[in-house]
Amino acid sequence: MLNWIRSGAPWIWLTGGAVSISLLSVLGLLLLIGWKGLTYFWPAPLYQWNVTSLTPVQGEVLHENTILIGQIYERSFVPRSYLPVDAVKKLDEDEDFATRLNIKIANRELYPADFISVLQMQLDEPTTPKEWAVIERSSGGYFFGKLVAFQDGDKLYQTDIQTVLNKKLDDAETLRHEIDSLVVDQLKDLGWKLEQLRLDKRKHELNNTVTDDFLAQNLQQKEQVEQELAKLDLQLDGLRLQLSGYALIVEDMTGSHVSIPLEDILDYWYPNQMSLPDKVMHWGKQVWKFLSEDPRESNSEGGVFPAIFGTVFLVLIMSIIVMPLGVVAAIYLHEYAKNNAFTRIIRIAVINLAGVPSIVYGVFGLGFFVYTIGASIDNVFYAERLPAPTFGTPGLLWSALTLAVFTLPVVIVTTEEGLTRIPSSVRHGSLALGATQFETLWRVVLPMATPAIITGLILAIARAAGEVAPLMLVGVVKLASSLPVDGQFPYVHLDRKFMHLGFHIYDVGFQTSNIEAARPLVYATSFLLVTVIVGLNLTAISIRNNLREKYRTLGQD
């Protein structure tokens, strides 16, 4: 036994077990958030229960001989000691737990909450009626009901409702796309022109160069733009009017008839009539909508495309900033600076910077970048916009710079380690052939150190992509009205605020009023953030591997 311990075999098993536990933990975490997130888009069946007794639910009472329609959201087990006396009497002697159902009943405008919690013993066996539909709305959440009629102005269709509704939904979708196109392509452009005219006038006033001819020309252009705006408003009002006048009449679980305007209906489906291929197609459609649409209902519904775009774009801008700074700093420290007390202090400071909490970088970015540099830029280049700030307020540029400072130590350390691994004989050979130190560095050393530089980029992306705390101070918002990139000059707007997947997770998980409904969305967004980070890292790793193979013959590896 002692010989076996002295051989080192136990430590091999110990390290192997630690690696296995780490891998299982990571895979288990990914499976958990992946399963809970991706099942959010699966069309869950609608159940119907008959209430068999007076059932208290969240301060209210479900009366006998009524039906309950909903989706089973969660099952939990309640110990016997936690149950009311009447519920304990219904338990068998050998039963120590009762099953509690968390049921989503939707229909938010009719009931005080989307969810109710009830003991399963107080309900009879559920059925899955095929006539009940799930209606997805632009506001108000989902609606569960039976289609009764479709109202087209004065006409009321009570037969072949689905055919009429499908046609009207297609027409409504076409009108929505046309309205969105006019708003994005023309309305925003006209608003931008009006703002530019106002700023141009303000700039001339500040420079004391206002003339009567300029004022007349400015007024004429303003009136022309306002006329175009008035025409566009009339066109938009006409399109919106075409959406009104239609309504779907639906019966809810109490037997009441509810009128839902067509303009509020996004989609509908019968989950209990779907086959497995239908459910798979519906799941894929919902996943695509999640990835490609904007959020709605205070981020608790809809898609996350602005957050995906903001996250990826922020990482790209951060990488563009941090890579030159980190590489140049590492080159100076390794190739040019003397090994004295000053450079040793710099290296110690760089290493210690990696341990500073991220929120401290956020405070630094807010105080230095936003309030100092940003305010100075506004005073010099955007005086006509004051007192409204342009760069003197949190935005994408300051967020990227803050994350660049946050990840700078990682890039410096990995790049310097890569430069250290290059054999000195390579440098001496280049210098012996007549190359200068800069030519040796540019044509020989840096290409061979590229894999290490890309490794620094990978670590920087992995560290920065999921950071939220500093971004809350320097640019991220709950909902951004515009993307940082659009068709208006200068096309890339680094002064704009943006959305981020990490902050979106925090906002949906802790800031929404309907936390039960938003919980699956938290898992889905978390899984998406992990996927985005892994995708960015795999891209950088593939580039590094290609470069490593390219310079392998030079003895780099």
Residue ranges and their predicted role:
Residues 1-16, 20-28, 34-299, 555-557:
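Membrane-topology segments of multi-pass transport proteins
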Residues 283-302, 337, 361-405, 475-477, ...:
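Membrane-interfacial helix termini and adjacent extracytoplasmic/periplasmic loops
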Residues 298, 475-527:
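Interhelical loop and adjacent transmembrane-helix boundary motif
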Residues 318-350, 363, 540-549:
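Transmembrane-helix boundary motif in ABC transporter permease subunits
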Residues 324-329, 360-363, 398, 405-426, ...:
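Membrane-embedded alpha-helices of multi-pass transport/permease systems
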Residues 412-416, 423, 437-475:
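Transmembrane alpha-helices
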Residues 416-424, 458, 503-557:
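C-terminal transmembrane helix and the adjacent membrane-cytosol boundary/short C-terminal tail
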